[in-house]
Curated annotation (Swiss-Prot):
Its EC number is 2.7.7.6. Belongs to the archaeal Rpo11/eukaryotic RPB11/RPC19 RNA polymerase subunit family. Its main location: cytoplasm. One of its GO terms (cellular component) is cytoplasm. The keyword Metal-binding does not apply. This is DNA-directed RNA polymerase subunit Rpo11. Disulfide bonds: none annotated. It is found in: Cytoplasm. It catalyses: RNA(n) + a ribonucleoside 5'-triphosphate = RNA(n+1) + diphosphate. Part of the RNA polymerase complex. It comes from the Archaea. It comes from Methanopyrus kandleri (strain AV19 / DSM 6324 / JCM 9639 / NBRC 100938). GO terms for biological process: DNA-templated transcription. The gene is rpo11. InterPro entries: RBP11-like, RBP11-like_dimer, RNA_pol_Rpb11_13-16kDa_CS, Rpo11-like.
Length: 112
C-alpha cells in the first residue's frame, strides 16, 4: 500500500520536546497523531491550525500562509518526545493496516 506523502518541517527535535510544521495538512492527520501521542504516559501533544483563510488552499498571498504546528512534550523524566513520535507513527500505521484488512474482508464477504 502506497501511503500519501506528508511534508514535515522539524523545528525542534530533542528528548523533552519535538516541534513540527505540517504544511498542507489539516485536522485529519494532526488529530490522529495527537490522539496516538496523548495515549502514551508522560507525553502531552497539541497542535494548532490557523483560520482557513490563512490555510494553503485558501491563501491569497504566499507570505501569509501559516502551516499547522504540532508540539510534543515529555512531561515525565523517563519520557522521550522523539520516541513517543516514532511509537505513535507505528501505532497509526498498524491501525491503518488493520482497517484495510477489515474492509477487504467485509468486501470479500459481500461479493460471495
Amino acid at each position: 500500500m502506497k501511503l500519501p506523502e506528508v511534508e514535515v518541517v522539524v523545528k525542534k527535535y530533542d528528548k523533552d520536546e519535538v516541534l513540527l510544521e505540517l504544511p498542507g495538512e489539516d485536522h485529519t492527520l494532526c488529530n490522529l497523531l495527537r490522539w496516538a501521542l496523548n495515549r502514551q504516559d508522560g507525553i502531552i501533544a497539541t497542535y494548532r491550525i490557523e483560520h482557513p483563510i490563512l490555510g494553503k488552499e485558501h491563501k491569497v498571498d504566499e507570505e501569509r500562509y501559516v502551516p499547522p504546528k504540532m508540539r510534543i512534550r515529555a512531561v515525565d523524566e523517563d519520557a522521550d518526545a522523539r520516541e513517543a513520535l516514532e511509537r505513535a507513527i507505528e501505532e497509526l500505521l498498524e491501525l491503518v493496516e488493520e482497517a484495510k484488512e477489515e474492509f477487504s474482508g467485509a468486501l470479500e464477504e459481500k461479493e460471495s
